[in-house]
Each structure stands twice: as C-alpha cells, then as structure tokens.
Amino acid sequence: MKKVTYFHLATCPYCKQADRAIEELIAEHPEYAAVEFERINEYEHPEIADQYDYQCNPCMFIGKEKIYESHLFEKADECRMHVEKVLKRALEA
C-alpha cells in the first residue's frame, strides 16, 4: 500500500467535497481506512507544493504520479468517483 499525498486549502469548497467523499467511502468500505494520507496545505507548505505538478486543489498523488486533480465546477459525484479511484490505487500499490 502506498501513501497518498493530498494537497488542499482550508477554505476550498472542492477540498471539503473531497474530504466528505473520503469519509463516506471509508464508512462504506472499511478497508479504505488503511490508506495513509499526507495532507499538505499548499499555503502553509509552498516549498513542498512546488515540487509537484498541479494547478487545482484538491489534488492527490501516489508518489509523484498525479491520480486526481479537481477542476472548477466539479460535482460531488464526480469528485467521489475520483477519490475512490485514488483509494483503490493506494491499496493496490
């Protein structure tokens, strides 16, 4: 299993949407609780964020591979689908 590096912002509505998706998916699939997230606020740690190639938050990487990056006007169900893909990939790795 691999760690997920999760870039977020405290006031980002799309990040809150991703957080809800993580909570819901773990409640539905307890095996996802084993996935370790390294949550990095890009405002607080720009020196880390600058090492990764992304434009939007939330954004999730496994290693240096970008698995999910949100986009403007992303709907909750689309976010959830991408977050589940991240969780599955982390468990398989």
What are these regions, as identified by a protein language model?
Residues 32-46:
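Thiol-based oxidoreductase modules, predominantly thioredoxin-like and allied folds used
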Residues 1-28:
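Local sequence-structure signature of Cys/Sec-based thiol-disulfide redox active-site neighborhoods
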Residues 13, 44, 74:
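Short alpha-helical
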Residues 49:
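A hydrophobic alpha-helix adjacent to the NAD(P)-binding/active-site core of NAD(P)-dependent oxidoreductases
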Residues 52-62:
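Structural micro-motif
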Residues 27-31, 92:
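Secondary-structure boundary motif
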Residues 62-93:
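Non-catalytic, surface beta->alpha helical segment in thiol-disulfide oxidoreductase systems
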